[in-house]
Amino acid sequence: MGKVFRSYFYFFVLLQIFAGTSFADDSLLRINSILDSHCIQCHGEGGKVKGKVNLKELQSANLLSSKPELLESLIGVIKDREMPPEEETPLSDSEREELLKWLEVKLSDSIKDQPFLPTQIRRMNRFQYNNSVVDLLELDRPIFRLNERLMRRRDNYFKPETRKMPPQVRISTRPLSKDIDNQRPEGFRGVASFPQDKRAEHGYDNRADHLTLSPLLMESFLNLSQTISESPDLNSKECRSWSWLFASPESANAEDVEEIIRTRLTKLLRRAFRRPVDPVTLDRFVKFTLDQRDAGATFEDSMRSVIAVVLSMPDFLYFYGVSDSKNPADESAKKQIIRDFELASRLALFFWSSIPDDVLLDLAAEGKLSDPKVLSLQIDRMLNDHKSSRFCDNFPAQWLQLDRLITSVPDPKKFSYFYLVDGYRSSMHMMPEPLLLFETIFIEDRSIIELLDPKYTWENAMLKANYEGHAKAGHDVVTQLFKRVPLSDPRRGGVISNAAVMTMTATPTRTQPITRGAWINAVIFNDPPEPPPADIPPLPEDDTEELAKLTIRERLAAHRERKDCAGCHNKIDPMGFAMENYGPTGVWRDKYENGRDVDVSGVLFNQHEFKTFLEFKEIIVKEKERFVRGFISHLLSYALSRELGPTDSPALDEMTDRAMSGEDSMRAVLKSIAMSDPFLQMDNFKRNEKIEDSKSKVPQSP
């Protein structure tokens, strides 16, 4: 971890800055003398580097200015009051503010001419692929059983254009082979499975560095596209594009048929490839279609063959940009404004997890989409479109890491009420609570602060019973009626204090304050802690007679005694122990099983003392700027499909300031991201190598 040593390092560097001295030789001698005594032995001496901090590399002020990551870290430890260390004299508020301003100016100067972090060329993930095929072919239902959707809507209540959620909704949270409302199979018959996607640690499943296209995967996509084109469910009843794509032309004249094919393929390929199709490619596809017909295939079967080819091509599977620069080397040297067609794709991926529609593509073709006024109106239109439900299907569940709840199995002997009829668990009633809260804030365009402290929640009878620590029998455990209810108990509500999060961050028998604290740091503030040392053993699940007498805080005391653990625990433990009133299934408790009182007291952000959970919650809301910045940074990372870096900091600062000044509604925040510099700048990657290499591996039938 090395956080203690880093704090010493930052402290002594900043003393020089605050004193107004430069990194002249005499000051370097004095700093090095201190560092030799406290830090060098672990951070540079003999090639030994702990915590990825090498103090011997620091030789001048210019070198410090050339390290934006270091400057960003300095700003972070000052804001979090991790610097100076506890053993040193603390900075006054005025000193701290002055230092932060100075460092932020240095960081701004350091990165002003630097490009944004590159986004690798990335392929579609499973969710994006399904949505893109559905939108391309205008299908009435998914081609896959969408396990990514942890919650399914059984009412047609998602109507963002109304800005109003109904008082009750019918949903389900269990993957089913049948659609409950109309008894249609979910997913197209005969469609092959999609290759398994990876998810980045502390990231999302749309991250470019985890979405590649190896030869083995390419073979899988070829098979997948073939099965889609051959599915019996791809028919005139399920496919609204049938009339303009698959239906045989009325005219039998060869010239008319060729022109009709060309017109249809122009529309299809522009949609599929998210840009105008070049004449050579279009001619190849037209010739391929005509050759199919000359070989005896029907018009419908010829178009099915075209679909099979299109859905397996890198032009469809990959998302990438095209630079205006004729010299690829120039792309990494400067920031370039994004092209309109790439902007259309980026917007559709962010809000719809899909391809752009014809409106976006038409505006891109006219060069109007990047106009700020036009862009603003299009963002409003996209957020009011029903397809924005996909954003609510995808982002909040990943942000909150709710898939962890699926594998939560509280001890049946201790928590028998958790298990319902036929093996169903209470977790399926816990999951909708935070997801419906997110949807409400999105649809009604409410303040994102309500994610922390709403005055309402969503519950059904079985979830209410779980909070009370008992079971409620019910026959309809799959399709659930959730009602929006006002909160009279301030201990409930929000994305932190709910049964779903409390259950998924516990073991089968006990709570895990460290896990809960790490979750709050990573999810709520986007400040994930470093992994613990490999030699730290987990707490035993089975209590010995001696351990049974201790509280969780007493059991974990040994971890804090290690110098390489103390720094992280100072940040994690207060947040984790603040949640100790919530048992392993989210039921409130004041005492442990051994009769000992639950102690939730702590110091938050190294400055705010609290003794109860409610005091903790008040501090979190009071320090809402930390949450606002963390939430926006999560959204920006999701929108860009990459991790963030120092060059993104100015945009994050600007968006956070705007939200704190009153523009904190969900849609205002989403719009600010889609109109931010990082979102509107060209990806700085070398396009040709990977995309052309992948194209060479695809059978080029046309």
Range-by-range predicted roles:
Residues 25-51, 65-73, 77-702:
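Low-complexity, glycine/serine/threonine/alanine-rich intrinsically disordered linker
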Residues 21-23:
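Signal peptide processing junction and immediate N-terminal pro/mature segment
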Residues 60-64:
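A short acidic, often aromatic-flanked loop/helix-cap motif at beta-alpha or helix-coil junctions
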Residues 56-59, 84:
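Residue-level detector of conserved, well-ordered beta-strand and adjacent loop positions
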